[in-house]
Amino acid sequence: MKALLKKIFQNKKISSDKDLKFLDLKNNKGVNKIFGAINNYNETSEIRYVGGCVRKILNDEKTDDIDLATNLTPDQVKQCLDKNQIKFFETGIEHGTITAVIDDQNFEITTLRKDVKTDGRHAVVEYTTNWKEDSLRRDFSINSIYSDLDGNLYDPNSGHKDLNVGIIKFIGDPETRIKEDYLRIIRYLRFYTEYSKIDHEINIIKIIKKNIEGLGKISKERQFNELKKILKLDNFLKLFNNKTSCELFSLIFPQLKNFKKLSKLSKPQEKILKNKSLNFVISFLVIDETDNSDYFAVSYTHLTLPTKWTV
């Protein structure tokens, strides 16, 4: 009984921001089934939305993936799902992640973790029941916001505030976080492009440049996946209108040497570009003057552009 009361009042203490933006998710059959299964496991069991799922809801974006965190171990999660006849896969069991499937929708459920050691690519983790510890291993404050089913936030790193004012803030020491996983260099550029409302911090840029060669430890597949996420942003052209962002982009992806042309596109041309396929955008970035990129742009789109991209 004592543990149950602690669970109830702990939630009230750490979360005072009920947000109606979570109402649509609350009405999701799968969400309710999973929250019920985990929360009813024992007196101390908890599950919350986390990461990009919360960030997007708070920013009025469409939520594609539902990421969940729990203080139960993976084995306990599997017991909960089995008991409630919920299908699941051990997709990331080595990282503490179980993927539940309800009505063809995936729900990633990950046990709270803390880092033990890392080599700049992958971290060795151990499970914890401490939400604060789990938050401290995440990359940016805007990705360390948790929410219960009703939209009550647990925000130990002030990520909601940073999201509102447009600050991309590393959790803890930026250089330490980058060295834990060098892919965070590209992730920084992506989140800065998508959410930032202020200029880059000089110190952050210095640290990124100092550690840029660490990306050599990251597989090309992981790097390319981040590039695709950047180019799929609704406002990805914002990146090419910022001098510092352009400099970082050229250091990270030197092959995409034609990116400077994107900063000179007219509004109609920008609109056309955003409607093109990802392959087209990447091809346009790769082809340089010797390959006649203007001709390629028109030819590839079967003359749907009103004029050649003479920029």
Regions found by a protein language model. Name each.
Residues M1-L303, K308-V311:
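Catalytic cores of the polymerase beta-like nucleotidyltransferase superfamily
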